[in-house]
Amino acid sequence: MNTLGIDPKGTLMVHLSCKAIGEVEGHGETLLDLLAEYMEPGLLVLPSHTWHSVGTENPVMDVLYTPACTGALTEVFRRRPGVWRSLHPTHSLAALGRDAREFLAGEEHISTPCGKGGAYYKLWERDAQILLLGVNFTRNTFIHGIEDWDGALGSVSEEKTDLYVINYQGNRVYTPQHRHCSRVGSDTFSKLEPDALQQGILTLGRFGDATTRLMWARPLREMVAAILKRDPGYLLRY
C-alpha cells in the first residue's frame, strides 16, 4: 500500500474487485485485513450502497440487515467488528477507523445520493484519497457527487421518492430522496480518465494482477467541475 502512495493517516475511499486482484491467500478477508491494518491510524471507507433493492416497491433500508449491492467484499467489510454504516437509504458508506462515526453522521438528512453535507461531500472537504482497486472510473461514485454539487444536467430527479431508514436503535426515519435519473448512469465516467492522467490527478499502479487508480478528491472535483461549467451535459454523452 505504501508503494501506491496511500497516506495511512488520511481518509481512503476504496472501490475494489477481489476477482481482478487474482489469487489471494485467505481470499477477500486477507485483503480487508491488509487495508484495515495499513489504514489503522486513519480512516478506511468502502461503499455499502442499497440502491438496487431500496426504492418505490421496497422503501425501507435497515442499517443492520439490508445487504450492500456493491459486491460481496463490501458486505463482508460492513459486518466486521468496529465498522459503522451510514444511514443513507440508497448510498450508505461503511467506515472503520479514527473518526468513523463522526464522518458518517447525518446521512439520514441528505436528500440526494451524494449530497452536500453527507459522507461523499466530506471526502472532498478533507481531501480524501480515492483508490480504484481492479475497477475503473465507472465505479467512482464520488463523481456522482460532483455532478450533484457542480451543476451537471440530468443528474437527479426533480421529484422525491419517499424512503426510510431503520437506524441502529431500531427506529424508522423518514428520508425522502431525489434519486439518480441519468440515462447513462456512471458509464461515461471513463471519459474523465485521460484528462485526470494528463493533469497529474490520477496515478496508476499495480496490486496483484489488478490495475490501481489513485487520486485525491479535491483536484478531481476541481477538474470535473471545470468541465461541467463549460458543458453541463458532458457526462450525459458517450
Regions of interest found by a model, annotated:
Residues M1-Y238:
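N-terminal and secondary-structure boundary signal
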